[in-house]
Amino acid sequence: MAAIVIVGAQWGDEGKGKATDILGGLVDYVVKPNGGNNAGHTVVVGGEKYELKLLPAGVLSETATPILGNGVVINLEALFEEIDGLEARGADASRLRISANAHLVAPYHQIMDRVQERFLGKRAIGTTGRGIGPTYQDKVGRVGIRVQDIFDESILRQKIESALDVKNQVLVKMYNRKAIVAEETVQYFLSYADRLRPMVIDATLELNKALDEGKHVLMEGGQATMLDVDHGTYPFVTSSNPTAGGACVGSGVGPTRITSTLGIIKAYTTRVGAGPFPTELFDKWGEYLQTVGGEVGVNTGRKRRCGWYDSVIARYASRVNGFTDYFLTKLDVLTGIGEIPICVAYEVDGVRHDEMPMTQSDFHHAKPIFETMPAWDEDITGCRTFEELPQKAQDYVRRLEELSGARFSYIGVGPGRDQTIVLHDVMES
């Protein structure tokens, strides 16, 4: 029995999809425990590139059962568009299962999201506008709509009418928008009920039974540690807990059943949207990482902000999640760049901080303290063992490992599933 949690260690886009794709073929279940269609990931299988948003990367596994857990917020229109797109390319999504307790994104959530961001102007957080935050707000406010609700029309109608009593007041009186008609939202959800019904299960029961039977479960967290609503760069965060603890809550698998926690981290750092970013680059190297690394958001098409590796964040992520292992990705992007700076600490108002500053105000003012290491010029995309890497690449990896708080067990040297060096197998941990 193995229960492995995959967590992004930075601000997302670290390569979680690749890690899930590799491990997904070795497990019986792949679970997405949080998030929605606001964070995409790219998976390359058999030379084919798949861009997934709501579905877990495990949907591309030929054997694993993919599950959307209770912590996910689901846009049904986006869900079925993604399923249809995969099946049109020959992929089989028929094994997908969905927790009855997952919450649903209503059209009015998307409207509220976009209107609020527009109203905030320069103070906007930079959301994707897909209604994720407002859906989580309704969940916490106990006025949300869950998957199970669309199979009972009277409950569904009651919940929607109750929610719109308040939301229409806000839309009309505060934002000068038209009121939303409740019946249109009711019919929107009912139109998906028949197709959705065969997919819905008691996911918590299913997963715990599987673990009792000695089966293997992989939990694929969305977003990343630094976007966690509690542990991230608040308020420039998502509305859920994409950390290891959140994976337990969003799946119904208890923390004592977790056998490994795998942090996914790039050999440099990226971020999408607003918020502090101490190692961000504004010169030719930022453009270089953006271009060579293909740093454009899968979900939004926005260019990602790029910067050097930040070991302060790596140590923080390791501590918050209790990482047993790290999966280092995109090492190949750093080939041939001369010298590679590594952020080892921050300076805040003249004081050195080796760990994450306690306050967001200090983090906003943090200046990186760098040490540099020489880069390598050799092509490493064909390396399959650590010893095949150039010595300078080996030295860089080992230095990052020393600084980051957990052992490096996987190294990505290209986008393909096979372009991975395995130092330690978490399935055997």
From Swiss-Prot:
Catalysed reaction(s) here are: IMP + L-aspartate + GTP = N(6)-(1,2-dicarboxyethyl)-AMP + GDP + phosphate + 2 H(+)
Give the molecular function GO annotations. adenylosuccinate synthase activity; GTP binding; magnesium ion binding
**What pathway does this protein act in?**
Purine metabolism; AMP biosynthesis via de novo pathway; AMP from IMP: step 1/2
In this chain, substrate is annotated as bound at: V298, N299, T300, G301, R302, K303, R304
Cytoplasm as a keyword of this entry, yes or no, is yes
Where is this protein localized, as stated in its record?
A: Cytoplasm
User: What does the UniProt keyword field contain?
Assistant: Cytoplasm, GTP-binding, Ligase, Magnesium, Metal-binding, Nucleotide-binding, Purine biosynthesis
Family matches, as Pfam families: Adenylsucc_synt (PF00709)
Q: Which GO terms describe its cellular component?
A: cytoplasm
By sequence similarity, the record places it as follows: Belongs to the adenylosuccinate synthetase family.
**What name has this protein been given in UniProt?**
Adenylosuccinate synthetase
